[in-house]
Amino acid sequence: MKPLRGNFDTQYNTYIAAGEPLIFHCHHYNTFLQATLEDTKDYIDIYPILIESAQEIVYAQMNQFFSENQIAEIEERKQIAEDFFMFCGYGKFSLENVSVDGGKVVSESDHYSYGWKSKFGLRAENEPMVSFFTRGFLAGATEAIFNLALGSMECKQLSCYTKNDSFVSFELTKNINSKKLSNSPKQGTTQNHTLNNPNNTSVNYLGIREALTNMPIEGTPSSKGIIDAFGVLLTRMYSNYYCQTSYRMLKKLEETMGSDGLMLADQLLTEAGHVCAFNTFGGIMQSAEWNGLIKPMCQTREDWVHGIVAVVNAFGWGFWEILELEPAKKLVVKVTNGYEANSYLQTLGKSSIPISFLAKGGTKGIMNLIYNGDITTQPSLTDEYYSEICNSPKAFSVRQTKCRAMGDDQDIFEVYL
């Protein structure tokens, strides 16, 4: 079997695998973003968006990989899909019982099901099971494996850890009439750039990127496809999955609620980015990896800001550069080739509002963690601590002052008191 893998492309600061950009995010962001999207279910039909966005992306990626490598044998194609799912930290399943007509899939572990239960606990009886991404992955991969049309497979979830089941399982069936789905935006509208070491910090951005991008951060058979690293459960997730689900939600809210819908989407998605920063960046800055590699470079609290921004530059989110840092008062960050703008520009074109919600919430989270909450003292990253930070008179605000999707040549974020 030829495994599906990618390479970290330093001219884009992104990991590309068979045409699809993949980025590191953890279970806190994955599950909180999904919960955020689910909060709109009374206004829009969100569940097909959560499934079909994954289906489109996986179908495109698998088709490209099979075609480029002339892989025609069905069993090898199945092994490639199983292996890539595991490698990315999504979990572990077997397609042994899946045919061109569908079949049942039993998963030994599933990131979304396991991660949701870990973060939020069990779901209520009237709530659906949570592995929407996996349902889309299975449908798209099966279509590609058997040379079926995109939208011809349906996948439902039969059991889930969040329902107190002891395993996770799914069932694939063929649609009588194929759904009309869209093509993946793939890399989108990209920008080339070069990462440099700033001259106002002892933090070695290039060295950190080199070290982190060469670390074996991957799911394995022994870990059942779960990546436990930096104090969180990591995934190498499709950036287009975050973007397609988020922006489709945004557009649906705009259609149903007008400008109020846009404002609601902005608030929800920015908060998801802030929660991501609190848990992901906070977990990283308390991890053994941070203490061994990055903390020795940090002489001041400003170096901590540079340290976590250097880490972001290894996560595939594009190029993050600090333009201005006023201790405990202000942070200005420029993002080049940000995955949010890349995807939005390719699929939707120009926007009437700034759309880089993850970066917006993430930059705000950095300042709140380091200057408001003082992550250097190793606090417990609890919900209570998060509320304390958010309600503090020292809490930071953020605005996106430039946006590529609005016609600017870069994305700029200003965090301020």
Q: What label would you give each PLM region?
A:
Residues 1-133, 147-358, 362, 372-398, ...:
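N-terminal accessory segment detector
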